[in-house]
């Protein structure tokens, strides 16, 4: 950072307008182990507790079957979109915020919104204060990601337009079945609603495509934590980047304060071979979460679905 912000450093200086830093969210900025991702726990809660009357029995079965280590694939994301069909964007945003106030059983004294890794939040602030523009590039749906970020320690450093995520289909209310949005116009007081349709899951190559489409410049810093982030990492450190660039990977190797499952030696060697700089949660994070938050005795807690 000192080198790229020094105008006297002709070889490495990066103008402010080009200081782009991109962060994955789940597992990079935030917890993904209570007992799974924020958006997935929200889906489970919506289907099985908060609004079971709004969803099909099929979606309830999908929600009830989710366990730690499940695959967060496009099929599941499509089910998320189906569950929230008919909600306005304001209603959906508000529900994502409301859900964050609930407590997880996978950690003690932790609401879902208390999910930010404090060292990563400090890093976001540090980069922002040194002229970097911060983007969150998440596999979580875009509006949900915005709700999380807006109620987090990084809310002052990441604006809603700097959040890129998975996209559900959204239509103007009353025109959900009209194939083309070119066939009608928005008027004062109209609502935008989730149709249940799905556009794109923001993982793997879609991350680099979305960055190109929505930012239009290569980042100079990228932070991730899994294979689904490697396209974003590689796009950042591509040899055609006109500026010096680095990519970092968070390794979930802390088994005391977190539900870590990764081996540091194995993952660090893998990442270094790919040109990424590994970050150890166990060794590099002096504190992970806020005061009083500790790992619970068990990660997964079965639900009583008798009702």
Question: What would you call each of these model-derived segments?
Answer:
Residues 1-25, 33-34, 47, 52:
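Non-catalytic pre-domain segments flanking phosphatase-related domains
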Residues 2-5, 9-11, 65, 195-196, ...:
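Mixed-charge, polar/low-complexity N-terminal
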Residues 6-9, 13-15, 73, 78, ...:
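Residue-level detector of functional hotspots within protein domains
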Residues 13, 18, 94-135, 139-307:
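C-terminal cap/substrate-recognition subdomain and adjoining C-terminal extension
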Residues 34-35, 40-114, 118:
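A metal-dependent, Asp-based hydrolase signature
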């Amino acid at each position: 950072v000192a080198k790229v912000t020094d105008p006297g450093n002709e070889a490495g200086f990066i103008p402010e307008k080009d200081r782009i830093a991109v962060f994955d969210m789940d597992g990079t900025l935030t917890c993904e182990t209570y007992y799974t991702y924020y958006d997935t726990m929200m889906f489970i809660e919506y289907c099985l507790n908060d609004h079971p009357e709004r969803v099909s029995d099929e979606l309830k079965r999908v929600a009830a079957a989710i366990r730690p280590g499940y695959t967060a694939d496009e099929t599941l994301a499509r089910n998320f979109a189906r569950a929230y069909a008919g909600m306005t964007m304001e209603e959906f945003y508000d529900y994502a915020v409301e859900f964050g106030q609930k407590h997880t059983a996978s950690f003690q004294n932790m609401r879902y919104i208390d999910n930010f890794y404090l060292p990563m939040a400090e890093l976001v602030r540090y980069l922002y204060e040194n002229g970097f523009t911060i983007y969150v590039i998440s596999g979580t749906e875009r509006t949900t990601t915005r709700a999380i970020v807006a109620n987090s320690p990084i809310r002052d450093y990441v604006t809603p337009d700097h959040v890129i995520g998975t996209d559900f289909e959204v239509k103007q209310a009353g025109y959900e079945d009209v194939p083309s949005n070119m066939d009608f116009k928005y008027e004062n007081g109209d609502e935008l609603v989730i149709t249940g349709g799905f556009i794109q899951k923001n993982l793997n190559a879609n991350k680099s495509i979305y960055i190109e489409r929505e930012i239009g410049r290569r980042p100079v810093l990228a932070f991730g934590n899994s294979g689904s982030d490697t396209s974003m990492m590689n796009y950042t450190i591509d040899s055609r980047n006109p500026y010096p660039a680095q990519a970092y990977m968070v390794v979930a190797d802390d088994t005391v304060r977190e539900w870590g499952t990764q081996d540091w030696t194995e993952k660090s060697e893998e990442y270094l071979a790919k040109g990424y700089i590994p970050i150890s949660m166990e060794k590099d994070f002096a504190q992970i979460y806020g005061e009083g938050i500790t790992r619970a005795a068990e990660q997964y807690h079965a639900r009583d679905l008798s009702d």
